């Protein structure tokens, strides 16, 4: 789950990380009132969307008068902001953040992310923060510093000092960095975040550090422990199909292809998508119905997939372990009738009650294409949608 910058900064502030004063705004008038309340003399008008690259896309503007704030807010609010993370369709700006301008001297980068390979938390930092951090990582990777933190011990002052020195901090700024990194790590762990990123982390002319941006991703599986974070969710920023799927406890992610996929188990779902691509097709989605799918959930899964006009065929690939093949067969038959299926459907089932499930499909009277292997299933659905 993602949140907006202004929400992320409130979380950082609650952990003692220094951030500029700012006020969210949902209308141009609210933006003007926010600027008046902050007092100036310089403000930054920021688009609030769940994507990076806002500055390059024209979603971050400096204003030096109240009239400037009004003009910039009018330009940004409601615009379709296109960045390298939104895709060509862009994202509509529905919220703004009006913030005090900052004395920017050096723009640094710092983030925390879980490294699954080492089962540790990676503190990633760079002296080259700002809008071009992706290019820095690509062209000069030696400027990206990574320090692994053992979750059993947490981040140590020695590690923080090492990273601070590596990104060019000196004197009192190092002490500030040690304090900031410790607070950032506590924030990361206490909120069950999967990513906390500050870009840029400003070091001003007096050597003081301040987070000028905040990006958070949270582990969706831990949200039950954080109702205060769930309350920050902005459904307008999410794929409507993914929001709908979450209501039925379906793991769904939209993709760009034309073959809908319904699978039980994340690993099998990824293998199924890979096999479709291997045989020349393009998956339209990742969809894991899980081990406790009911006929009702399967029906809803079909409805969600078929709301995508790109879908020209569906592949159902089920391994019956906890999930029984006859249960899936019942769901598939019910779904086909409920949605009046008009696209090709290939079903491959293996495992518990496999023969019963296949018999039910064969006797359903529906034009369902059967397959015994993943390769056969992928081949048949790719041919069917051509």
Swiss-Prot record:
| Gene Ontology annotations for the cellular component aspect, listed alphabetically | cytosol; succinate-CoA ligase complex
Q: Where is the ATP-grasp domain?
A: 9-244
Which biological pathway? Answer: Carbohydrate metabolism; tricarboxylic acid cycle; succinate from succinyl-CoA (ligase route): step 1/1
The chemistry this enzyme catalyses reads:
succinate + ATP + CoA = succinyl-CoA + ADP + phosphate; GTP + succinate + CoA = succinyl-CoA + GDP + phosphate
Q: Which Gene3D superfamilies match?
A: ATP-grasp fold, A domain, ATP-grasp fold, B domain, Succinyl-CoA synthetase domains
Where along the chain is Mg(2+) bound? Answer: 199, 213
* GO terms for biological process, alphabetical: succinyl-CoA metabolic process; tricarboxylic acid cycle
Q: Which of UniProt's keywords are assigned here?
A: ATP-binding, Ligase, Magnesium, Metal-binding, Nucleotide-binding, Tricarboxylic acid cycle
Entry EC number(s): 6.2.1.5
| CC cofactor | Mg(2+)
Does the record bear Nucleotide-binding in its keywords?
yes
Q: Which residues bind substrate?
A: 264, 321-323
**A Gene Ontology molecular-function term?**
magnesium ion binding
Q: For ATP, which residues are the binding ones?
A: 46, 53-55, 99, 102, 107
Q: How is the cofactor bound?
A: Binds 1 Mg(2+) ion per subunit.
Family the entry assigns: Belongs to the succinate/malate CoA ligase beta subunit family.
What is said about its interaction partners and assembly? Heterotetramer of two alpha and two beta subunits.
- Functional note: Succinyl-CoA synthetase functions in the citric acid cycle (TCA), coupling the hydrolysis of succinyl-CoA to the synthesis of either ATP or GTP and thus represents the only step of substrate-level phosphorylation in the TCA. The beta subunit provides nucleotide specificity of the enzyme and binds the substrate succinate, while the binding sites for coenzyme A and phosphate are found in the alpha subunit.
**By its UniProt entry, which PANTHER family does this protein fall under?**
SUCCINATE--COA LIGASE [GDP-FORMING] SUBUNIT BETA, MITOCHONDRIAL, SUCCINYL-COA SYNTHETASE BETA CHAIN
Name the chain's protein: Succinate--CoA ligase [ADP-forming] subunit beta
């Amino acid at each position: 789950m993602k949140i907006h910058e202004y929400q992320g900064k409130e979380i950082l502030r609650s952990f003692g990380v220094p951030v500029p004063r700012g006020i969210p705004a949902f209308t141009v008038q609210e933006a003007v009132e926010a600027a008046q309340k902050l007092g100036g003399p310089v403000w930054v008008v920021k688009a609030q969307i769940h994507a990076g690259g806002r500055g390059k896309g024209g979603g971050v503007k400096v204003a030096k008068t109240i009239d400037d704030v009004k003009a910039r807010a009018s330009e940004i609010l409601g615009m379709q902001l296109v960045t390298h993370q939104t895709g060509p369709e862009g994202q509509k700006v529905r919220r703004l953040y009006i913030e005090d301008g900052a004395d920017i001297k050096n723009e640094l980068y710092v983030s925390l992310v879980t490294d699954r390979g080492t089962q540790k938390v990676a503190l990633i930092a760079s002296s080259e923060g700002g809008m071009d951090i992706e290019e820095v990582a690509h062209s000069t990777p030696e400027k990206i510093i990574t320090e692994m933190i053992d979750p059993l011990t947490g981040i140590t002052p020695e590690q923080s000092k090492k990273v601070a020195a590596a990104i060019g901090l000196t004197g009192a700024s190092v002490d500030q960095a040690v304090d900031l990194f410790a607070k950032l790590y506590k924030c990361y762990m206490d909120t069950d975040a999967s990513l906390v990123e500050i870009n840029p982390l400003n070091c001003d002319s007096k050597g003081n550090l301040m987070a000028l941006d905040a990006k958070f991703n949270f582990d969706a599986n831990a949200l039950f422990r954080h109702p205060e974070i769930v309350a920050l969710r902005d459904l307008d920023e999410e794929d409507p199909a993914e929001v709908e799927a979450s209501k039925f406890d379906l793991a769904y992610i939209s993709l760009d292809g034309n073959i809908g996929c319904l699978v039980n188990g994340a690993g099998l779902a990824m293998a199924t998508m890979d096999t479709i691509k291997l045989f020349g097709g393009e998956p339209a989605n990742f969809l894991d119905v899980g081990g406790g799918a009911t006929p009702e959930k399967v029906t809803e899964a079909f409805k969600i997939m078929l709301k995508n006009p790109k879908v020209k065929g569906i592949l159902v690939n089920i391994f019956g372990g906890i999930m029984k093949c006859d249960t899936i067969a019942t769901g598939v038959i019910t779904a086909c009738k409920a949605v009046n299926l008009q696209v090709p459907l290939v079903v491959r089932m293996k495992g518990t009650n496999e023969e019963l499930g296949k018999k039910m499909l064969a006797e359903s009277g529906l034009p369902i294409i059967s397959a015994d292997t993943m390769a056969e299933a992928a081949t048949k659905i790719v041919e069917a949608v051509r």
